[in-house]
Amino acid sequence: MTHDLTLQSRASVTHDTHHLRFERPKDLMCKPGQAVDLTLMRDGWRDQARPFTPVNGSEGDTLDFIIKSYPDHEGVTAQIATLQPGEKVQVSDPWGAIHDAGPGTFIAGGAGITPFIAILRARLAREGTLAGSTLIFSNKTEADIILRDEFEAMEGLETIWLVTDETNPGPNVQSERIDRHFLRNHAKAENAPFYICGPDAMVDDIEEMLISFGIAKSDIIREDFS
């Protein structure tokens, strides 16, 4: 089943990331962490569905997305940056394997942060704390960190910011990759479950490393496109 959404507003979150707010159809219910396939209702783009994750659940009258734009790719995300209020998109029913299985370690790369936004917001609203949870968020540069202030203000959440393309980032940001050396310090059973989202190769590598450190596959939550 598909749903038609009307854009209410578009605002900048970072230099290349946009917050899109749509009117929510009453029959579209989305659990935190689930994705939808989104299609632009523009000529030449109606056969270009792409997966995006709402950053809010089924509460309220809107469906919100935070989407990183890649203008150099000349694809759907480049078009996202030019959407205007009143334009329509079409989305599928929600799908996906990423869900809230309780406090744990959230590992995100770039735009892979979006399912965790919804999960962490919902749990904080429900329980009042994110105690026992750690967010490890890797980006190319410090300017790419999405919603940093919001995450740092979340009660009980430990945040670890990593950048890969800057050698001298600002305070509380590490110039480091998520490799075996880094992950060894976090891959402990008491830090499970491990939630992973990001580029496919990154997710595969991290899952493989976690398993090699003795983490059970059942304690790893990731999207499965197989």
Functional labels for PLM-detected ranges:
Residues 2-85, 139-141, 164-166:
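Ferredoxin-reductase
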Residues 61, 72-226:
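FNR/FR-type flavoprotein reductase catalytic core
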